[in-house]
A protein has these predicted regions:
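N-terminal short leaders/motifs
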Residues: 8-24, 77-84, 89-92
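N-terminal post-signal-peptidase region of extra-cytosolic proteins
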Residues: 2-14, 18-19, 36-65, 141-142
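Arginine residue identity/basic-tract feature
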Residues: 26, 38-42, 66, 88-91
Length: 161
């Protein structure tokens, strides 16, 4: 999926490069930092299709949850699946019309979409960077402290090449 322009929150936005294995945090035109990330173990094989494929999804998302009780230190939940993912899932027979509508409506409302469909969910930017993930974006805890400070709910996150 292409990365569409998204308005920022307080000028803040995040770009994750799957090819570069980096996360860049910007506020307005200023780069706050670029750091290494660990992605889903199978992310080099393409875009996320369904739960359990261990691929970090590509596309335009927003921070829809903030968890300070995460087993991975701190976690910013992303709005995967987005409307494009829902369209693909419905077309390919992975989800039904009701699940499709719930995902699309949640994305329109700027809230957490259902994370319990066959498309998967609970894709987060989180700390405790170790090896590859099951689809999340892992950074070190010191980087997570910075992201936590800058990123309220609604901050746009683009995951691209």
């Amino acid at each position: 999926p292409g990365a569409a322009y998204q308005p920022s929150v307080n000028g803040v936005n995040i770009y994750v490069s799957k090819m570069g294995n980096t996360l860049t945090l910007k506020q307005y035109a200023q780069t706050i930092g670029t750091w290494p990330v660990k992605l889903g173990r199978r992310s080099e094989t393409g875009d996320k299709v369904q739960e359990g494929d261990e691929i970090t999804p590509s596309g335009s998302f927003y921070v829809c949850t903030r968890n300070d009780q995460s087993i991975c230190y701190l976690a910013l939940g992303l709005s995967y699946p987005n409307a494009e993912d829902a369209e693909r899932g419905l077309r390919d027979g992975l989800i039904n019309e009701e699940q499709y509508n719930a995902i699309v409506e949640a994305n329109k409302a700027g809230i957490q979409p259902p994370w319990n469909t066959p498309l998967g969910g609970a894709i987060e930017i989180h700390g405790d960077q170790g090896g590859g993930t099951s689809g999340c974006i892992a950074v070190t805890n010191d980087v997570m402290d910075i992201l936590w400070e800058y990123c309220p709910l609604g901050v746009p996150v683009t995951v691209g090449p």
